[in-house]
Curated annotation (Swiss-Prot):
GO terms for cellular component: extracellular region. It holds the Pfam family CBM_35. It is found in: Secreted. Residues 856-988, 994-1120 form the CBM6 domain. It comes from Sporosarcina globispora (Bacillus globisporus). One of its GO terms (molecular function) is glycosyltransferase activity. Keywords: Carbohydrate metabolism, Glycosyltransferase, Repeat, Secreted, Signal, Transferase. This is 1,6-alpha-glucosyltransferase. Optimum temperature is 45 degrees Celsius.
Length: 1284
């Protein structure tokens, strides 16, 4: 049944609001002189004009009959205007596009029948005559929703019914303090409003059943009920925001179609977003509390580390806020001296940095001395203050301020005119903060729903006119109401908490996980350009606690797969990647690099948003509206039409369940093919933090480019196009323009349509349409990578193309051609085609060639080049001969210079990676190899005949499944000598030893993760194999069918042999026995058996069957074609060497301090200081500290596997603050004299090592000791003891 009558409480609310808000009701109507009927009566007459049906409806004793005007404005959009008592219609609210005009539809309107009908190609509207009621149907007659006899349109809104199984969306999102979570709005009574702090909402209700409803209203009260099928909207009384545009008539739109079509319709009605500048697809660093020196140093560090960044945003630090008259609009030249002229702008333009400045809808009216300001006087005289908002003291500095009124066109002009100097001196983006409400001290004032829109209108119209359309406007604000998108504004989710989820650290702010629903519901409300404070903003202590490295890295990966990629923290906080340790830094950098490689792909969706209202991110229920599994799914989304993103968002996550809709999918990072329509268990490595689950939809066409430091750094002359043909034709439109101006609106753009299809039997087709638009980009050619088959013949418009021996030869060729090869996805045909031709090209690939490649080659000139400074970076050169590709890398004579490759592999394990190098320095040289943020080893590179001579050096490296970060670096701490040239690396497709951690396996029947014993591999082991049915199942991948050795690492401290059953691909292989070495559960050993596996994916499971005895602990599994030695990742003999284990569990480190002294040792992430004192690698590190005098040590004694051989000790340490009496690493009880390695007070992480430790007594004791007068801080991380 319907909810209780809403008219009475709404009217009461109206008059209550009148008392509370007084003058804020200037935009509200006077109460009507006559009452309105509660529902429509019978038809009196009808008339038809073109696509419009006008109905005169009896309203009883009221003067002037009601008017109902129904117009088919598009084939799938119906506009309805109800005018009770035939009143004069109110002006449209700013929600609707004021410039929108509708073309003739050619609807068929029949008024003779009962019901009357309006028919288009997409819809059939039936309207009964007695009483007048509407039913909305598809063109085929399928009923979608209808007005019940007791409902329908009336003076306060609309009342419809729909089938109770329909899923509803829109209406609302969530603010920064909500728990959030749901996308469904099947039963909702939440108000339609812009809300506060990251919220979005509006009078929009739509369904995946194929329809939507949009009411022209400034706020209001939607109501849906899943039990009754009610879909209603009430204008009601004044909302809490107070201010409101008046609506006497009821004007609404009905939209029919798919979710994508409905969102297009919303854009048609409320306005499409203009294209944002291309640079805004890049990475942005927002910061509170900075100055020119720090800003410049940070920018230079980004550039030195080759971490791409396009924009830097400043909080009030950039302004002379409260210091001078009109200081709100002026650069603070104390903080930014070069901004007194255009010098800072010129410097940052040269570095590729766009500067963004914060603005707020308020001005200073009295300075700190209570002197009235000029701008305050001007605003008073001009009538620019927001009605109902009084003066109050700002929380930022002790000055008196008052809200200005962007609803007022004169105020908008005034505000913009005073912003031009900032623009001239470098501010090209606007951070429009606090357009939702004032909350400062005792002051609490709400802004109206359209404040964000009008504030954005100020800067958009002003900036566009001021630059004559030559410079696109970019803005962000923290609320959204439909219509605001017309003014080039994005939405960010407000001051969210620095935590994984709400309640993890603080219970009054949302965390990272909640942002998924916030983003997706905002997209469902029509705001497709959304971002967040990556890393979080709020913390319990206000400004001190920072994200821990795991949280930071996972948040960066999440944010890289959203429309707007930005970091921000609270006052004094840093959010640059290098503050969070090497593991998090490298994972974050890889995420940024991935995004920058996808710029051509993403920019196509920037154009799409302008053309049809659908942007880069769409919820899965929009893309798959009939799939019940995704109706409320927030754990993944479409990133463009061809990529599904499902980032890791749980703390120290080891596996992730991901639902993939129907169809075929390919793992972007690992290359595995996956059948959709199921939930998969995705293994996650919490050690490396490199996993970014991203899946390619079969049929995908994905353009990518070489990563640049910033968008537009260099001309893009070649674009790679990865194509994954499906049996049905797929398409993608490549798009480009100048990226900066609005000339695209008049046809100055570049478009080229691409299609692809798998025709079977190795036959692939790819078409490149003729280019359209008048813009000519620098692009010269596409390298089309047709995955799935290596052809024997390729034609272009039926003419044979030239074949080349390799991809490198093809790239170097002057003209078009083709080659074959293999990559992580399998066999591939490469085709080089000229871009931008006036006629189309039809590429046909036939035949199936055998590809024998067993490795992938990664060129150094395509790698990430870094250094300790911009001047000392590794660099590309061509001044020698014999290199592969287009160049090689030199500059490794500078300490800190490095070359970082991003190889992809299907499975984790040990790989023989070969480095191609040149060294004619006269002696062997060395560089360190880092893998996923951790140093693995130094490699010695022999001297060669000359610099034109190249050789290879292979090293066994531990890689993780998916993308890896492999860096060759001159690292003087480790004794490297550098000064070599690097050409490429080759990485095998298959490992020497495949390694699968138990914590990432599929667990069932009671098996679970634990960390309460020592020396396990990875981050946990599996126990709970203590009851029938308990199982651990490893998902493995092998390159070919055959026999493999399986080594399962286990612990059995029961002092008796135990058994489990082994299953291969679901079939029982037999019972496996696990012997026991005694009662020590910290002793691990391998059970080895030979199994037969299929090529590709397999499962290996160990299960407690009825005949088994179970009760063992299980660790990692190794897979190899021959006997596996000790993997590189297991060569460190220490327990808990990086201090990552939860401190609630025991470990082999023994802490000592004098009995009369408090302990001065602990383990944490270093996140409680500004800047954070993060670990060297991983998520935690150990520390020594006490304010007073202290002695402290930790030690670990281990048994060595081989006696009378040499061992090596390594560690990373950082000492700061007071220099101690003694600080050292200690090595003792190994059969020789104690060895002490002193630690220097450098304030930065330093690598220390001791080699050639001859162990003769079967054990070794290593540790650290500090004797301090007080105030010394020592950080310790990644401690190692390995056999030399």
């Amino acid at each position: 049944m319907r909810p209780p009558n809403k008219e009475i409480p709404r009217i009461l609310a109206f008059f209550t609001a009148f008392t509370l808000f007084g003058s804020t009701l200037a935009l509200l109507p006077a109460p009507p002189a006559h009452a309105y009927v509660s529902s429509l009566g019978n038809l009196i007459s009808s008339s038809v004009t073109g696509d419009t049906l006008t109905l005169t409806v009896d309203n009883g004793a009221e003067p002037s009959d009601d008017l109902l005007i129904v117009q088919a404005v598009q084939n799938g959009i119906l506009k309805v205007d109800y005018r009770p008592n035939s009143i004069t219609p109110s002006a449209k609210t700013p929600m609707l596009d004021p410039n929108k005009t509708w073309s003739a539809v050619g609807a068929t309107i029949n008024t003779t029948a009962n019901p009357m009908t309006i028919t288009t190609s997409n819809m059939k509207i039936e309207i009964t005559k007695n009483p007048v009621r509407m039913t909305v149907k598809k063109a085929d007659g399928t009923t979608l929703f209808w007005e019940p006899s007791g409902g329908g349109v009336f003076s306060d809104g609309v009342r419809f019914l729909h089938a109770t199984g329909d899923n509803m969306y829109g209406i609302r999102s969530f603010n920064a303090f909500d728990s959030g979570g749901d996308l469904l709005r099947n039963s909702s009574n939440h108000a339609a409003h812009a809300g506060e702090q990251g919220d979005s909402g509006g009078p929009l209700i739509w369904s995946t059943a194929g329809y939507g409803l949009l009411v022209d209203s400034d706020g209001g009260y939607p109501y849906t009920d899943s039990t009754t099928g009610q879909m209603e909207f009430y204008y009601g009384g004044t909302p809490p925001e107070g201010r409101r545009y008046a609506k006497q008539n009821v004007e609404y739109y009905i939209m029919l179609g798919t979710p994508k079509e409905i969102m297009t319709d919303v854009g048609e009605i409320t306005g499409k977003p203009p294209m944002l500048p291309k640079w805004s697809l890049g990475f942005m660093n927002f910061e509170w509390d900075t100055n020119q020196t720090e800003f410049t140093n940070n920018v230079d560090t980004y550039r030195a580390k080759n971490i791409p960044i396009d924009a830097y945003a400043f909080d009030y630090d950039w302004k002379k806020y409260g210091e001078t008259n009109y200081g709100e609009f002026a650069w603070n030249t104390t903080n930014f001296p070069s901004a007194s002229t255009t010098s800072l702008k010129s410097t940052m333009d040269a570095k590729g940095i766009k500067m963004i400045g914060i603005t707020k809808p308020r001005i200073v009216t009295k300075d700190a001395s209570a002197n009235v300001t000029t701008q305050g006087t001007d605003a008073t005289n001009g009538g620019y203050f927001y009605p109902g908002h009084n003066e109050y003291q700002d929380y930022f500095i002790p000055v008196t301020v008052r809200s200005i009124d962007p609803y007022n066109a004169n105020e908008r002009a005034w505000f913009w005119n005073h912003s031009t100097d900032a623009l001239n001196k470098g501010i090209v983006g606007w951070w429009n903060d606090e357009t939702d409400k004032v909350s400062s001290g005792g002051a609490l004032y709400w802004f109206g729903n359209f404040t964000t829109g009008h504030m954005s209108q100020t800067m958009y119209e002003g900036g566009r006119a001021y630059t004559s359309g030559a410079q696109r406007v970019w803005q962000t604000a923290r609320t959204f109401y439909p219509g605001a998108q017309r003014y080039a504004t994005t939405l960010w989710s407000g001051d969210i908490g620095i935590q994984y989820n709400k309640g993890e650290r603080i219970n009054w702010a949302a965390g990272m996980q909640e942002q998924r629903a916030v983003m997706l519901s905002s997209v469902n409300n029509g705001q497709v350009k959304w971002g967040m404070d990556t890393g979080g903003f709020n913390q319990q202590d206000g400004t001190t606690n920072n994200p821990n490295p795991d949280l930071y890295a996972r948040w960066m990966q999440f944010s890289a797969l959203t429309p707007v990629f930005r970091v921000h923290g609270n006052n004094h906080q840093q959010r640059q990647p290098w503050y969070f340790g090497s593991t998090a830094e490298e994972a974050s950098k890889e995420a940024i690099q991935l995004r920058y490689s996808l710029i051509p792909y993403m920019y196509a969706y920037e154009r799409s948003a302008y053309e049809n209202g659908n942007g880069l991110v769409r919820p899965l229920m929009q893309a798959y509206p009939t799939d019940a599994a995704v109706k409320n799914y927030t754990d993944a989304w479409m990133f463009g039409d061809w990529l599904l993103a499902a980032p890791v968002v749980d703390k120290q996550q080891t596996s992730k369940d991901i639902y993939l809709p129907s169809g075929s999918w390919i793992d972007y990072a690992r290359g595995n093919a996956i059948t959709g329509g199921q939930t998969i268990r995705y293994s996650v490595n919490p050690d490396t933090l490199t996993d970014m689950p991203l899946f390619i939809k079969k049929g995908a066409i994905i353009p990518t480019q070489k990563v640049q430091d910033y968008v537009g750094q260099a001309s893009v002359t070649s674009v790679d196009v990865d194509v994954f043909p499906d049996t049905t034709q797929s398409s993608f439109t490549y798009y480009d323009d100048d990226g900066a101006s609005y000339n695209y609106e008049s046809g100055t753009y570049f478009k080229q349509n691409m299609t692809a299809q798998d025709n079977g039997s190795g036959s692939l087709s790819f078409t490149l349409g003729a280019k359209s638009g008048s813009y000519t980009p620098a692009l010269q050619s596409y390298i089309v990578k047709l995955h799935g088959s290596a052809g024997t013949s390729v034609t272009n418009n039926s003419a044979a193309m030239t074949s080349y021996a390799s991809l490198e030869a093809l790239k170097a060729a002057a003209g078009e051609g083709w080659a074959t090869g293999k990559d992580i996805y399998g066999d591939v045909t490469y085709v080089k085609v000229t871009a931008g031709t006036a006629s189309s090209k039809s590429i046909a690939v036939t035949g199936v060639a055998a590809v024998s490649a067993t490795t992938s080659q990664y060129e150094a000139e395509d790698a990430s080049l870094s250094g300790n400074s911009v001047a000392a970076k590794a660099s590309i050169n061509t001044n020698h001969t014999g290199y592969t590709g287009t160049g090689f890398v030199d500059g490794l004579g500078n300490d800190g210079a490095g070359v970082t490759f991003y190889p992809k592999v299907k499975t984790g394990g040990d790989y023989n990676v070969s480095l191609r190098y040149a060294n004619a320095s006269g002696t062997a040289k060395s560089v360190s190899i880092f893998v996923n943020g951790k140093r693995v080893k130094s490699t010695s590179l022999a001297n060669l005949a000359n610099w034109d001579t190249w050789s290879t050096q292979s090293e066994t490296l531990p890689l993780t499944a998916g993308v890896n970060v492999v860096t060759y670096k001159y690292y003087s701490d480790a004794g490297d000598t550098g000064n070599v040239n690097i050409d490429n690396i080759t990485v095998p497709f298959a490992p020497i030893i495949g390694k699968y951690e138990a914590e990432s396996a599929e667990l069932s029947g009671g098996s679970s993760l634990n960390t309460n014993h020592w020396y396990y591999s990875g981050t946990a082991f599996v126990d709970g194999l203590s009851a029938v049915g308990a199982q651990v199942k490893y998902n493995v991948n092998v390159p070919s069918a055959g026999s493999y050795q399986v080594a399962l690492r286990y612990a059995n401290g029961s002092a008796a042999t135990k058994t489990l059953s082994t299953y291969i691909n679901g079939a029982k292989l037999g019972q496996t026995s696990f012997t026991s070495p005694g009662t020590n559960w910290n002793v691990w050993q391998d059970n080895v058996q030979t199994v037969t596996l299929n090529a590709g994916a397999n499962t290996i499971a160990f299960k407690y069957d009825a005949a088994d005895s179970g009760n063992i602990n299980v660790d990692r599994l190794l897979l190899s074609t021959s006997a596996a030695g000790t993997p590189v990742s297991e060569q460190n003999l220490l327990d808990n060497p990086g201090f990552e284990r939860d401190t609630s569990q025991t470990n082999n480190w023994i802490e000592w301090h004098p009995g009369t002294q408090a302990v001065a040792f602990g383990v944490d992430s270093g996140s409680t200081t500004n800047p954070p004192e993060s670990p060297w690698s991983g998520d935690k590190r150990a520390y020594f500290f006490a304010a007073g005098a202290y002695q402290q040590s930790i030690h670990q004694t281990i048994s060595v596997p081989v006696n009378n051989v040499k061992y090596k000790f390594e560690a990373w340490v950082r000492m700061k603050n007071t220099t101690p009496t003694t600080a050292r690493a200690e090595i003792q009880n190994y059969g020789g004299s104690a060895i002490y390695a002193n630690i220097s007070n450098s304030g930065v992480w330093k690598y220390i090592s001791v080699s050639d430790i001859m162990v003769t007594n079967g054990q070794i004791d290593v540790g650290f000791y500090v004797d301090s007068p007080g105030g010394t801080t020592l950080h310790i991380d990644d401690v190692r003891v390995t056999k030399q």
